[in-house]
């Protein structure tokens, strides 16, 4: 088949495979467009879970008649015009793909009017070349988008839609997330002609807790601790639930936003989990609604098709900033209980500090926490204290890093506590849920960790190997098999074929599926950790290993595979190390409590400190 340019409709349908996963994806893209247009009211009508109808109506700025046809074209946008705009993006959308992709897999109609126009205009695309037709219409200032019969022309995609109830639940969750991001916008959601959600706008300076309670429930509101934390151009606001009263139902509330964009970021989740670890059990998760504001130049949002992930240029700084912000609020909560009465609480006495000697954290002190009212009230919550001015954070992150390391090198002051033997294993407490905080990368593959003033070195390749083994070891259900686009066919000896047949059930539990004939074996599926490996080298080595075995246990095979996998990282970065440890702590909590040999090595600084003092 010769190389040729794809027809516009087919190209858009391919793009829709990334952008339009289900009806909720359509709702997300269209509502974000409404927010970018400055809408203060958005009405969303859904029929049959979004499969039959999705209608989004807003009172935004509207689209000019001359731009309606462009609005349905690929890579046409008003959000950016240059690379500089992309590197400092503040709008929710910017690629100009959503409307073109949605219109290629549905019957989409766009009706809009600007304040300068006397009449509205309607546009829709049809045909193989996606030609746009524009005609007059009746409509107030703003925009309405109707998406009919989603996936009507792609039956393979349509059959993967779930039940009406399931698809609407995904839409409901998307609207919850958006409503938490924009308190200043009224959002109404209806399903099959019935109003399901009404989120009224909160006026500037009003009580955001009212909408927070409507979305997250009064149980979260009663346990919520308000956060207000700032350092340089980083700001963290929001609420985190008291970990001492977190329930499984509350743990489902985990909403995080970066510059108003809803995110699912493992680095942020790890920082929050680490701050709460001392108060959470092994099977508990923190509950939070947090808003991170950062210089747009310091974050890359163009890393995921649906913009669910971001990449921070200074991931360590962001991680430590969030960790310290959440930790400080939890510590304040221990010192000052949440006031439930109407009497103002006296402000705590200011204690003089010596920052250089004490080696305090390099982030600015937070404003005083405003406790969240346990029930709805038209008056502001009582007991709050005026925010203290932010200390000047301009000397720079690099300069203040020295204070952190000085803190780690300091000999701890004696504590007035009952006599207890000094710990022989410095790194981790028995009930710890975290390896600690990553300070830096040493020799490209080791992470220097700090926990409770103790320093240790962690081998990242060994941690990665244990993580791969956990991912490969079957639990109650077999490991999920990932079909290969091109099956791998290998020639085997009679002995190797016999070993494979004996190990077939064990390999199936590991997600490895194969077929054999007289002299060949065809690998048809492998587990996810093997997808990025060189299977033409790994699989023959695995077959050779199996040929030497007499007993085929899935755990032993998983251990062998994990030891022989090639690492994806020749040079580890801070972000990669933090992500790896977050996964290890989640999937292999036993490694935190009892680290195996070769994984963790404590670093004793006392001889170095003594040598310095003896000079």
Swiss-Prot record:
Membrane-spanning regions, if any? none
Has keyword DNA damage? Answer: yes
Q: Which UniProt keywords apply?
A: DNA damage, DNA repair
Q: What's the source species' lineage?
A: Bacteria, Pseudomonadati, Pseudomonadota, Gammaproteobacteria, Enterobacterales
Functional description taken from the UniProt entry: This protein is involved in the repair of mismatches in DNA. It is required for dam-dependent methyl-directed DNA mismatch repair. May act as a 'molecular matchmaker', a protein that promotes the formation of a stable complex between two or more DNA-binding proteins in an ATP-dependent manner without itself being part of a final effector complex.
Task: Please give the name of this protein.
Answer: DNA mismatch repair protein MutL
Q: What's a GO biological-process term for it? A: mismatch repair
InterPro entries on file: DNA_mismatch_repair_CS, DNA_mismatch_repair_MutL, DNA_mismatch_S5_2-like, HATPase_C_sf, MutL/Mlh/PMS, MutL/Mlh/Pms-like, MutL_C, MutL_C_dimsub
> Segment Disordered: which positions?
363-397
Q: Does the keyword DNA repair apply?
A: yes
> Could you tell me one molecular function GO term of this UniProt entry?
ATP-dependent DNA damage sensor activity
Q: Which family does it belong to?
A: Belongs to the DNA mismatch repair MutL/HexB family.
Name the domain of life this protein comes from.
Answer: Bacteria
Any single GO CC term annotated in Swiss-Prot or TrEMBL for this entry: mismatch repair complex
Please name the source species.
Shigella flexneri
> Compositional bias (Low complexity) spans?
364-387
Please name the Pfam families in this protein's record.
DNA_mis_repair, HATPase_c_3, MutL_C
């Amino acid at each position: 088949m010769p190389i040729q340019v794809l027809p516009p409709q087919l190209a858009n349908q391919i793009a829709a495979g990334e952008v339009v996963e289900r009806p909720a994806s359509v709702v997300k893209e269209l509502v974000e467009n409404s927010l970018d247009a400055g809408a203060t009211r958005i009405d969303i009508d859904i029929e049959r879970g979004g499969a039959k109808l999705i209608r989004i109506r807003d009172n935004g700025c509207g689209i000019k008649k001359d731009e309606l046809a462009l609005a349905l074209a690929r890579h046409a946008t008003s959000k950016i015009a240059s690379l500089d705009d992309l590197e400092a993006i503040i709008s929710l959308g910017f690629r100009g793909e959503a409307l073109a992709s949605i219109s290629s897999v549905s019957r989409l109609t766009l009706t809009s009017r600007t304040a300068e126009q006397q009449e509205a205009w309607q546009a829709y695309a049809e045909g193989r070349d996606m030609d746009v037709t524009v005609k007059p219409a009746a409509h107030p200032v703003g925009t309405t988008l109707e998406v009919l019969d989603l996936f009507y022309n792609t039956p393979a995609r349509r059959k993967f839609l779930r039940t009406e109830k399931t698809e609407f639940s995904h839409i409901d969750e998307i609207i919850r997330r958006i409503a938490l991001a924009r308190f200043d916008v009224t959002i109404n959601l209806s399903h099959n002609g019935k109003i399901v959600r009404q989120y009224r706008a909160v006026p500037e300076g009003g009580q955001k807790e009212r909408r927070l309670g409507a979305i997250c429930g009064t149980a979260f509101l009663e346990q919520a601790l308000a956060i207000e934390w700032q350092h340089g151009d980083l700001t963290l606001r929001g609420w985190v639930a008291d970990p001492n009263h977190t329930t499984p139902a509350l743990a489902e509330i985990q909403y995080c936003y970066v510059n108003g964009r809803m995110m699912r970021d493992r680095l942020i989740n790890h920082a929050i989990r680490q701050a709460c670890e001392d108060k959470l059990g092994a099977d508990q998760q923190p509950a939070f609604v947090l808003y991170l504001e950062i210089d747009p130049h310091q974050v890359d949002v163009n890393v995921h098709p649906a913009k669910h992930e971001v990449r921070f240029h200074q991931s360590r700084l962001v991680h430590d900033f969030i960790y310290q912000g959440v930790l400080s609020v939890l510590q304040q909560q221990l010192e000052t209980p949440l006031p439930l009465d109407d009497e103002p609480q006296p402000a705590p006495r200011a204690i003089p500090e010596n920052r250089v000697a004490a080696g305090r954290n390099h982030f600015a002190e937070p404003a005083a926490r405003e406790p969240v009212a346990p029930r709805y009230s038209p008056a502001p919550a009582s007991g709050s204290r005026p925010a203290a001015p932010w200390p000047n954070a301009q000397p720079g992150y690099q300069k203040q890093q020295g204070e952190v390391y000085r803190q780690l090198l300091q000999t701890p002051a004696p504590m007035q506590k009952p006599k207890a033997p000094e710990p022989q294993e410095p790194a981790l407490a028995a009930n710890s849920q975290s390896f600690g905080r990553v300070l830096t990368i040493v020799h490209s593959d080791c992470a220097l960790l700090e926990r409770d003033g103790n320093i240790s070195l962690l081998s990242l390749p060994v941690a990665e190997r244990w993580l791969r083994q956990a991912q490969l070891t079957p639990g109650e259900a077999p490991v999920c098999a990932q079909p290969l686009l091109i099956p791998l066919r290998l020639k085997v000896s009679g002995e190797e074929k016999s070993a494979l047949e004996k190990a077939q059930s064990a390999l199936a539990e590991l997600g490895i599926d194969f077929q054999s004939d007289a002299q060949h074996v065809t690998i048809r599926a492998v587990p996810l950790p093997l997808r990025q490996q060189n299977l033409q080298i790994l699989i023959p080595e695995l077959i050779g290993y199996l040929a030497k075995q007499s007993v085929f246990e899935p755990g032993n095979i998983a251990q062998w595979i994990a030891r022989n996998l090639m690492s994806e990282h020749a040079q580890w970065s801070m972000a990669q190390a933090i992500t790896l440890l977050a996964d290890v702590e989640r999937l292999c909590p036993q490694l935190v409590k009892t680290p195996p040999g070769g994984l963790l090595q404590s670093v004793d600084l006392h001889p170095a400190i003594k040598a310095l003092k003896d000079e």
